Amino acid sequence: FLPAIAGILSQLF
């Protein structure tokens, strides 16, 4: 799981 994707999900949710 890429940290970059986690950052985007944090902003969406």
UniProtKB/Swiss-Prot annotation:
Keywords for the protein's UniProt record, in alphabetical order: Amidation, Amphibian defense peptide, Cytolysis, Hemolysis, Secreted
Intracellular or extracellular location(s): Secreted
Major place of residence: secreted
Residues that bear Phenylalanine amide: 13
Expression sites (tissue/organ): Expressed by the skin glands.
The keyword Amino-acid biosynthesis belongs to this UniProt entry's keyword annotation: no
GO cellular component, one term: extracellular region
GO BP term, example: killing of cells of another organism
Source organism, top-level taxon: Eukaryota
Function field: Shows hemolytic activity.
Protein name: Hemolytic protein A1
